[in-house]
Amino acid sequence: MAIILKNGKSFNKDGVIERTELKIENGFITAIGSKLHSEEADEVIDVQGKLISAGFIDLHVHLREPGGEAKETIATGTLAAAKGGFTTVAAMPNTRPVPDTKEQMEWLCKRIRETAYVHVLPYAAITVGQQGTELTDFAALKEAGAFAFTDDGVGVQSAGMMYEAMKRAAALDMAIVAHCEDNTLANRGVVHDGEFAHRYGLYGIPSVCESVHIARDVLLAEATGCHYHVCHISTKESVRVVRDAKRAGIRVTAEVTPHHLLLCDEDIPGPDANYKMNPPLRSKEDREALIEGLLDGTIDFIATDHAPHTEAEKQKGINAAPFGIVGLETAFPLLYTHLVETNILTLKQLIDLLTVKPAECFGLPLGKLAVGERADITIIDLETEEAIDPQTFVSRGKNTPFAGWKCKGWPVMTFVGGKLVWQKGRE
């Protein structure tokens, strides 16, 4: 079946927006031009002047299945991804059970094939049960379909354990993806160790809790030659460590979340658990350093750390509620409105940070809008302004600090392998 998307616009190879029509056949892009022959298509879709982009890639998502289906499932999480314009996501392993054996990884891959709306890359755990005491069988997990290795949700506390993990990963040409948190410094914290924590008498998580862990790991990465990736970087000290490591030629990459780019602890209105995430919202100076790191290439791409929880869990109060917020359905509108329309990023930079940049970091054949590429495509309305309403989310999680924020840049159609998997108004 041949589909033509007509009356669109996209970036050409020189980074200039131009009129675009695009043909999809057998799951791939087969033609791009300013005017294609509609009679050659089985279906013609008029995108009415909207932006045609390669589908977004999110390499940090919690789909919660198995074991956390009250929060999210592979089906609901990937439909939320499609609604947000994401055509590929990577699923974190802090599920129950953890994908730490060949059999569990095979089960997970089968479940993904059966229920996912978008492409899902499954992470395997670094340690058995994510307990930090015994390494998993990396070779068997890779053979079973693991994308990379991480214990995200907790940091690997033992330097010796991480050193051995990096050696094994390097031998398999696989990445170690790290949640960086030194438990001896975390101090039972629930928010950043700053003015907000002090005002409300809350335990704080100091910046050094993260940066010390990263500093340790980049030296281990240098010693092993492993590709080491830093999850959800959040402090100015961490940015400095990663910048120095890159200058030294160490194979390190890093991601940042939309919420750490847009919010700081000064923005928290009170002890509201929808502002509780790990790492926490840091200082204004940290947020500015993250933006600077994104602009100078220290930080490689943006990932949401989509972390759905039930309403009941988030109503337990800021001390008892779990860490995490949702992000798949709001990431692009928030970033477009508050970084592009404010001239911090260009539209081309933002799209690259959500497409080609994550693909390049992990060697994925994704993220490009070109003839011969897989037809993973999102269509974006850059003009219509709407307020974020958690009750309209297709994710089971409604936990967001951005409720009521007015944004432009809403995805309206998402194609995965040439198949229309989500369209606004046809939910």
Curated annotation (Swiss-Prot):
Q: List positions binding Zn(2+) 1.
A: H60, H62, D152, D305
* Residues the entry annotates as binding Zn(2+) 2: D152, H179, H232
Cofactor comment in the record?
Binds 2 Zn(2+) ions per subunit.
Chain residues that bind substrate: H62, L63, R64, N94, N278, H309, F323, G324
Q: What GO CC annotations are associated with the protein?
A: cytoplasm
As recorded in UniProt, its EC number(s) are 3.5.2.3
Any one Gene Ontology molecular-function term assigned to this protein's record: allantoinase activity
Please describe what this protein does: Catalyzes the reversible cyclization of carbamoyl aspartate to dihydroorotate.
> What's the encoding gene here?
pyrC
Give the protein's cofactors: Zn(2+)
Where does this protein act, in terms of pathway?
Pyrimidine metabolism; UMP biosynthesis via de novo pathway; (S)-dihydroorotate from bicarbonate: step 3/3
Q: Which GO terms describe its biological process?
A: 'de novo' UMP biosynthetic process; purine nucleobase catabolic process
> Which key words tag this protein in UniProt?
Hydrolase, Metal-binding, Pyrimidine biosynthesis, Zinc
- Spell out the family assignment given in the record's similarity comment: Belongs to the metallo-dependent hydrolases superfamily. DHOase family. Class I DHOase subfamily.
This enzyme catalyses: (S)-dihydroorotate + H2O = N-carbamoyl-L-aspartate + H(+)
Q: What class of enzyme is it?
A: hydrolase
Q: Where is the active site?
A: D305
Pfam families associated with the record: Amidohydro_1
Q: What is this protein called?
A: Dihydroorotase
The highest taxon in the source lineage is Bacteria
